[in-house]
Amino acid sequence: MKPGSPPHGAVMLAGLALMAVLASVIFALSRSAVVSADKARSMALADASAKSVATWYAQVLNYDAYTNRAIAANEIMMAQAVTMVAWTQYVEELAQNIGTVAALIPALQPVATWVQQVSTVTHQLATTGALLEVPLRSAYTRALQSSQSIMHTSANAFAAQALVNEVVWTGDPRFFGQLIASTSPSSFFNFTRNFTGEERADFASLIRNSQDSYSRQRGFTQRLYLMPTVSCIPRNLDQAFARLNRRGGTWLTADLQDWESADTLSIHTWRRRSRWNPTCGGTGESIPLGWGAADASVSGSDGMNEDPAGLRVNPSAFARARDQAVSIPGYLGLSSHRELTDITQQARRDALIRVPVLVRLDMGKIAKIKAGSKVFDAKASGSETSRAAPLGDALWSLGVAETYFLRPPDTLGGRSEREFANLFAPFWESRLVLANSADRAVAIALAQARGNK
């Protein structure tokens, strides 16, 4: 063949063959790229939808923790209100009794009168505030508990599936996602429940322990050095003087239906052992100086039902406090609350919720590439360990997430021990995890069942 002459014969055939090979390679690469992109998108959508549901569950559980804390805080605030009413009544009675004594000293009368007026106004303000505050706060605790039930009712299996659909279809409307039954669809619903009746005992203990020390129990016993013992022969220094006994406290009753508070102050003097033994034996209440009591109860009845603060040390003052107790209506009792269904230590250690999601893309929806008049369907070759693989007439991906409890180390206050799952600390989180054998078995069964149709 002369230089510059057009190609012909075997050279032309070789060129056409080379062009065909190049076209086939380009097509194969394009086909592989399309399927690889859909495979990656399928895995991403499975992970995103599973993580979204697990995060939603974590948010609901954290809401339970915050509302449980809010219920406890409102109970403590009601206890403080009842404490203020009892204490201001106690101060008012004490001021009046001191004023009676001060009336014998003209120079002290103006001061005593001013103290009486201030104490009376303070008690009236405290009572008015408590009458408004206790019903509102008690109703608010009921609203918080109701909101917990509403949140858990809304977080059902149908809503979780709707969230999966929203995440998947927002990412790519060609895909379809579903929660699979390797984990019970009602696992989140059964994970927690309302604690009522006697089940609230631990919650009540938490509230009692959260009271400040003064509200919980306030009292002292002091010697009155200005009041020496004259009715018997002292045998030691302590018996040489009278005693000033102060007792008071605020408590939630055992039936969890009342907040009670009382304060008493009395002078105790030493008594002789017997008519024939003039030495000092024991003390007895001689002069009640101050008393006050308040009761916020479901029944609205006056009086003290219990005495965990030792108020009966001053029997006369305590009797007057009970007779004059201020009744604060509107308290609805300790609210029920949400807690883990199984509160054993082992269950709380292993508490978590698994969310497995299977995402499907029908092969008919995978992009198709035409070469001349022939249509080539994109097919992927996935290994058994791949989370996205073709089976039957669809591409399948499995994503699994967990809702779990983990308190950050910097919030443990230097403690080395681990805090187990509970609904009082808002540290519920979500994470992606590997599928287990049950997840894979259910996913394969669903894929095969669809392929056999």
Residue spans for each PLM region:
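Long, compositionally biased low-complexity segments
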Residues: 72-453
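Alpha-helical assembly-interface signal, strongest on the long, hydrophobic N-terminal helix that forms
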Residues: 1-86
